[in-house]
From Swiss-Prot:
InterPro entries on file: FAD/NAD-bd_sf, Flavin_mOase, Flavin_mOase-like, Flavin_mOase_4, FMO-like
SUPFAM superfamilies named in the record: FAD/NAD(P)-binding domain
Gene Ontology terms: biological process: energy homeostasis; negative regulation of fatty acid oxidation; xenobiotic catabolic process
The name this protein goes by in its record: Dimethylaniline monooxygenase [N-oxide-forming] 4
Catalytic activities: N,N-dimethylaniline + NADPH + O2 + H(+) = N,N-dimethylaniline N-oxide + NADP(+) + H2O
A single cellular component GO annotation: endoplasmic reticulum membrane
Chain ranges passing through the membrane: 517-537
UniProt superkingdom: Eukaryota
Cellular compartment(s): Microsome membrane; Endoplasmic reticulum membrane
Organism: Homo sapiens (Human)
Protein EC: 1.14.13.8
Main location class: membrane
Cofactor(s) required for function per UniProt: FAD
Keywords, comma-separated and alphabetical: Endoplasmic reticulum, FAD, Flavoprotein, Membrane, Microsome, Monooxygenase, NADP, Oxidoreductase, Transmembrane, Transmembrane helix
């Protein structure tokens, strides 16, 4: 008899979790509190239902080839970066293609998820749900929580003295949908993440003035990179990841800063990272131009509000502010769990590989999508779901929970004492995390093996963008179309741009032509290092750290 799995949420991660359950012959039942799929990608005119939704002008930050499900590429005519409507259409196509809708119970709220009395033997859960005022109870063999981390708006009013005296409008970005209603107003946006940048840029076209306040600053990335190719596809490559492991981090950071400042000087634009703060990045194509045109004014952090003004850290005062928009993120919670599980699941240090809670005797509960990645969250959550369903089925194993819990508790104590830094909120390197989870499943691509069997494919896998299809080339869940998807990914990237063909126009050399000149030596070196132990790689990197940085910097400067 197939194991019954409860999937909480029918957003991006919920849909992939349903499909992965079906792929492993499990029996999923998905509970979705709204009336449709897509989660935050389903646009609504308001957020009165308490659910976080996208604002109307939102455009994806990760290109289509990097943010698709691994066995379901976007149509070639889809734009590389798309609005929320196009992306939701893709989710709908995915759900219909794999016949997932029949597993979803809409307008159903999960009230509680509790361990059954015999949990230590069975690993089963009691799940109580409510639909149209009627409660239902069911027993499940496993649970996948796919509610994401955009749940509760974080509105830190207590951190801003005088905010309660302010007579203007105060709102969180969750409430922002369209720029209408802000015409002629002076708007202060607090927080500079992707959302803060987007809202500030959009309001700069209608508001009288937009002030953008940031404590830390940020590096601003554009969606397009060299030769106009999508930025994600140019930097998220195994060859780049290999180089990053060998070359000194100081040198790599210097190169990155030099490249980003080449577009515009971040310090001159008031965007440079505050000294002592961690570097962070946002994707925004228009912010520099808006600052250059004076439509957006960069400000330091706010230290105090009055009835109509804001006082900033640098001593400046901005008068006659009409609206304050907090783009200060979200907090996540699991109200349907009991303590101590409820609190433990909010601490990422107590989640094995950011997925499995460590305090459970049986690995029958998984938190999907509670992770920050330097890349596509969609492909990351899909790979998590593939791993989790195989653990549920007994095909993959995880270490004993007692040992993991002990190690995590010790690490937490060391963090509190200042011995270790708390990195739980840091974003994970995309390729490293994906490879880690793929290795647990048995789907991590073997570069040496690919090079021996299929050199052309190996070349694309190592030097090309690390698209999700790479994790369908081998092992469980292998997809016969993965090879072709990888070899044609640039065709799908360029197809939506080919709307005006100029006869006999000169075509710039592609990146692959340049790679061929230096790729073979790097590939050979990487193959040798891959065959060696990671200890050897670490030794090489450590030796190079201090010795190479001054030389490389001086060489680069000429």
């Amino acid at each position: 008899m197939a194991k019954k799995v409860a999937v909480i949420g029918a957003g991006v991660s919920g849909l992939s979790s349903i499909k992965c359950c079906v792929d492993e012959d499990l029996e999923p039942t998905c509970f979705e509190r709204s009336d449709d799929i897509g989660g935050l990608w389903k646009f609504t005119e308001s957020s009165k239902d308490g659910m976080t939704r996208v604002y109307k002008s939102l455009v994806t930050n990760v290109c289509k080839e990097m943010s698709c499900y691994s066995d379901f590429p976007f149509h070639e005519d889809y734009p590389n970066f798309m609005n929320h409507e196009k992306f939701w259409d893709y989710l709908q196509e995915f759900a219909e293609h794999f016949d997932l809708l029949k597993y979803i119970q809409f307008k159903t709220t999960v009230c509680s998820i509790t361990k059954r009395p015999d949990f230590s033997e069975t690993g089963q859960w009691d799940v109580v749900t409510e639909t149209e005022g009627k409660q239902n109870r069911a027993v499940f063999d496993a649970v996948m929580v796919c509610t994401g981390h955009f749940l509760n708006p974080h509105l830190p009013l207590e951190a801003f003295p005088g905010i309660h005296k302010f007579k203007g409008q105060i709102l969180h970005s969750q409430e922002y949908k369209i720029p209408e209603g802000f015409q002629g107003k002076r708007v202060l946006v607090i927080g500079l993440g992707n959302t803060g940048g987007d809202i500030a840029v959009e309001l700069s076209r209608t508001a009288a003035q937009v002030l953008l306040s940031t404590r830390t600053g940020t590096w601003v990335l554009g969606r397009s990179s060299d030769w106009g190719y999508p930025y994600n596809m140019m930097v998220t490559r195994r060859c780049c990841s290999f180089i990053a492991q060998v070359l000194p981090s100081r040198f790599l950071n210097w190169i990155q800063e030099r490249k980003l400042n080449k577009r515009f000087n971040h310090e001159d634009y008031g965007l440079s990272i505050t000294k002592g703060k961690k570097a962070k990045f946002i994707v925004n194509d228009e912010l520099p131009n808006c600052i250059l045109c004076g439509a957006i004014t960069m400000k330091t952090s706010v230290i105090e509000f009055t009835e109509t003004s804001a006082v900033f850290e640098d001593g400046t005062v901005e008068e006659n502010i009409d609206v304050v928009i907090f783009t200060t993120g979200y907090t996540f919670s699991f109200p349907f769990f009991e303590e101590p599980l409820k609190s433990l699941c909010t601490k990422k240090i107590f989640l094995y590989k950011q997925v499995f809670p460590l305090n459970l005797e049986r690995a029958t509960l998984a938190i999907i999508g509670l992770i920050g990645l330097k890349g596509s969250i969609l492909s990351g959550t899909e790979l998590q779901a593939r791993w989790v369903t195989r653990v549920f089925k007994g095909l993959c194993k995880i270490p004993p929970s007692q040992k993991l819990m002990m190690e995590a508790t010790e690490k937490e104590q060391l963090i509190k004492r200042g011995v270790f830094k708390d990195t739980s909120k840091d974003k994970f390197d995309y390729i490293a995390y994906m490879d880690d989870i793929a290795a647990c499943i048995g789907t991590k691509p073997s570069i040496p093996l690919l090079f021996l069997k299929d050199p052309r494919l190996a070349w694309e896998v190592f030097f090309g963008p690390c698209t999700p299809y790479q994790y369908r080339l081998m092992g469980p869940g292998k997809w016969d179309g993965a090879r072709n998807a990888i070899l044609t990914q640039w065709d799908r990237t360029l197809k939506p741009l080919k709307t005006r063909i100029v006869p006999d126009s000169s075509k710039p050399a592609s990146m692959s032509h340049y790679l061929k000149a230096w790729g073979a030596p790097v590939l050979l070196a990487s193959l040798l290092l891959i065959c060696k132990s990671s200890l050897f790689l670490k030794l090489v990197r450590d030796k190079l750290q201090d010795r190479m940085s001054p030389y490389l910097v001086s060489l680069w400067r000429g």
